[in-house]
Design a protein with these regions (language model features):
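Intrinsically disordered, low-complexity segments enriched in serine/threonine/proline/glycine
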Residues: 8-9, 15
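Residue-identity detector for glycine
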Residues: 3-4, 10
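Motif-centric detector for short Cys/His coordination patterns
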Residues: 33, 38-167
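Positively charged N-terminal leader segments that act as targeting/secretion signals
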Residues: 14-25, 52
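Generic detector of N-terminal low-structure segments
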Residues: 15, 28, 35-37
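Residue positions that mark polypeptide boundaries
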Residues: 1, 24-27, 38
Length: 167
């Protein structure tokens, strides 16, 4: 390469190099843009989603208390978080591959591990530890707790299972 002009066997390929360089630059830009979009989606880094400022586990009552930076709070039961785990084990790898979680009334959280600055990994007493709970997913769960819980109860009943209330 000499001043942006490629020569091979005495021939100059300035136009080819320029077109190739432009196409390569555009391809790299699109690849970079798509990767950034995918990474933001996968990691739960929606900039508009409130972030937790305090996460407390109340083991006796089996509740996870989360306070967000927009002054909202939520209390999510360990059972709720377990049956709504964002893991592939629970959600599957595509639509229709979900696995209904049953007999999780007594589950508790044994550990909370931070994952970067975008999520936590919850370790449950039944051994489940593959779900990464992003900030936007936790916020979504807090905002839609009742609807998600009722949907879960309906799915249990449709599958012929009964939840044993532990109150």
């Amino acid at each position: 390469m000499n001043g942006g002009i490629l020569t091979t066997n005495g021939k100059t390929f300035k136009k080819a190099v320029t077109k190739t360089a432009i196409l390569l630059a555009i391809s790299l830009h699109l690849l970079s843009f798509n990767f950034i979009q995918l990474r933001a989606f996968m990691s739960g880094l929606d900039q508009n989603t409130p972030r937790p400022i305090d996460i407390r586990l109340h083991q006796a009552s089996k509740l996870l208390e989360i306070k967000f930076d927009n002054h909202t709070e939520c209390m999510l039961s360990c059972e709720f978080l377990r049956v709504h785990s964002p893991s592939a084990e629970v959600r599957g790898h595509g639509a229709g591959q979900e696995t209904l979680q049953i007999d999780k009334e007594n589950v508790n959280i044994s550990a909370i591990e931070p994952i970067g600055n975008y999520a936590v990994k919850l370790v449950f007493t039944d051994g489940h530890d593959t779900g990464l709970y992003s900030w936007d997913y936790l916020y979504y769960c807090g905002q839609h707790y009742e609807a998600m819980w009722q949907d879960y109860i309906a799915k249990l009943e449709m599958a012929g299972h009964k939840r044993i209330d532990q109150t």
